Structures are given as C-alpha cells and as structure tokens.
C-alpha cells in the first residue's frame, strides 16, 4: 500500500521518491523478511542526469550519475528549446559515481518542444527533461555600474579586490538586516559543477556567503563553512566610496561559482546592483556567475 494506506496493485512497481509499504500477508515474519532480502530489482536506466544544466555561451555543463555497479559508457546529446548539441559527446563513467561533462551546443530555430538531454546507452535512447540555466562568465577583472573588481583563485585561496562608488554613508547597520544598509554581498561556490539528482540548486557545503559592511565596527560577516576569523579583510574609505582587499582560505577547482550584490542605502531608498543576471542568489547556487576556465576533457 502507499503512504496514505491505499492498496497498490501487486507485481512490478516503479520506484520513485514516493514511498510505499510491503505487507507480509499470509507469510510468517521469517518468510516475509527472506522474500524482502531476495526481492529482484531491475535498473532500466543505470545513468541519469541532474534536472538542470549550466550554460555559459555555447557550452552546457551537465552532470551524469551512474547508479549501477558497472562502468557505463554511451553517447550524450541535446535537443529542444531552440538548442542542439554541436555533435554527440561520448562518455564513460565508473560505477557508483557522478561526473560532469561539457557539451558544445548551438542555437537553432526555436521550437515549442521542451529541452531534453538524450542518453544513448546499451542500445536504448533515454530522453530526460532538463532546465538550462544561463550563467555569466566572469573574468579576472569585472565591472558593475558602481564598482570594479579583480578576482584570483587557486593554491588554497580566493583573493578579491574591489573599488565601490558609494559616497552616501548609511551609518552603522544597527538593527537593520545587513542587506538593507551599505553592504557588499559575496556569493561563492567552490564546486559549481556538482549537480545532484535532487535539488541541484540548493546550497551545499561548498557554498558560502560573505557580507562586507564598511561603515560598521565589525565589517565582515560570514554564512557557511568559512569563518570570518580565517579571512583577511582590509578596507579603505575614499571620497567616492570605499575599496577593499579580501583573502579567503578555500580550495577551488578550475571553475568557481561567484557573484556580487552591492547594497547602497541612502535615506529611505535602497539601490541594489548585481554582477550577473542570476535571480534569487540567496538560495539558488546555480544562478551564480562562473569564474575561471575549465580545461578540455
């Protein structure tokens, strides 16, 4: 029966996130447990993809999960939603692992059909709906309407330097939320291509946020695994605003999820400026911009 006590037809049943209960019927406890231990399971699709992919220009980053006990190899493609793969991509994944792949793509005449990832595996083609999220590429130097910055990462550290134009002093934060005063919100993800099968947009242990409040006695606030005491922050005020240099101890790969939101409070108004085009950065790490360059596979 299902979670609500409704009877489920006996026979082969598709396993999903919705649980159901097995009942012993006329079997004894020992007979029932023996049958459960020997219950046959069939994995029709041993390789699955995360429900989202991250697009940067003409590249789409996807993550494939091999849920079987055998190495799997096949061909990866994309269709629908006005996108297609430039050419099929061959893949090979060890058992019980997940791996990210970079798929070259191009735009085609827009179609009404949804975007689907195609997996040709063991003689069968599987089609999986996928949400394509477009991310901005951030270089070593970047600009916002009211700021400019430099970003470096590698060798166990992230180094960020920024010059912010904000000549209106909002005073100390006091009881206000940090993002409702003069503040620089920083978003980091040291493993941005890790896309789980469930809730790939959710923050992970590799995601953290930092808040810089230049007008406060305590100027650095952290959320996540990074501690403020482990960071080195230097802030200087100037007639047009302020500048800072921030060094963060963090292991990174070739790509870094990164974004900036500058909050400028002046009286009863609040101006917000964001580096990338991502929405709801405070809860969706897949919306972060991407910095760095991944080497060819």
Regions found by a protein language model. Give the residues of each.
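Asparagine-centered strand-capping/turn motif at beta-strand->loop junctions
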Residues: 63-70
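Terminal connector regions
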Residues: 24-58, 107-134
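Beta-strand-rich recognition/accessory modules
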Residues: 1-48, 238-270, 275
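Solvent-exposed, conformationally flexible loop/turn segments
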Residues: 10-12, 52-57, 94-100, 131-139
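Structural preference for beta-rich elements and adjacent junctions enriched in aromatics
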Residues: 110, 114-297
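Short beta-strand and strand-turn-strand segments in soluble, beta-rich domains
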Residues: 1, 79-88, 223-232
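Contiguous beta-strand segments within globular domains
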Residues: 54-61, 155-159
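Intrinsically disordered, low-complexity Pro/Gly/Ser/Thr-rich segments with frequent PxxP/GP/PP motifs
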Residues: 2-13, 82-110
């Amino acid at each position: 029966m299902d979670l609500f006590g409704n009877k489920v037809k006996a026979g082969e049943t598709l396993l999903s996130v919705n649980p159901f209960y097995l009942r012993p019927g006329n079997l004894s406890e020992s007979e029932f447990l023996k049958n459960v231990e020997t219950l046959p399971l069939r994995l029709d699709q041993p390789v699955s993809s995360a429900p989202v992919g991250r697009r940067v220009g003409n590249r789409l980053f996807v993550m494939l999960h091999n849920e079987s006990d055998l190495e799997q190899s096949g061909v990866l493609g994309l269709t629908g939603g006005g996108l297609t793969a430039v050419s099929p991509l061959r893949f090979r994944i060890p058992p019980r692992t997940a791996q990210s792949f970079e798929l070259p793509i191009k735009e085609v005449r827009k179609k009404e059909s949804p975007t689907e990832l195609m997996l040709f595996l063991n003689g069968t083609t599987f089609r999986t709906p996928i949400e394509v999220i477009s991310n901005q590429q951030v270089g070593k130097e970047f600009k916002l309407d009211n700021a400019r910055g430099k970003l470096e990462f590698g060798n166990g550290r992230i180094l960020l330097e920024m010059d912010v134009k904000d000549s209106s002093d909002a005073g100390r934060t006091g009881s206000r939320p940090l993002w409702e005063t003069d503040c620089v919100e920083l978003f980091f993800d040291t493993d941005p291509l890790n896309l789980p099968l469930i809730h790939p947009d959710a923050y992970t242990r590799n995601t953290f946020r930092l808040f810089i409040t230049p007008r406060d006695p305590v100027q650095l606030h952290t959320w996540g695994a990074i501690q403020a005491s482990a960071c080195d922050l230097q802030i200087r005020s100037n007639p047009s605003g302020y500048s800072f240099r921030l060094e963060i101890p963090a292991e990174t790969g070739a790509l870094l999820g990164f974004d900036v939101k500058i909050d400028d409070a002046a009286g009863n108004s609040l101006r917000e400026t964001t580096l990338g085009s991502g929405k709801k950065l405070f809860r969706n790490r897949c919306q972060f911009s991407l910095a760095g360059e991944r080497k060819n596979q």
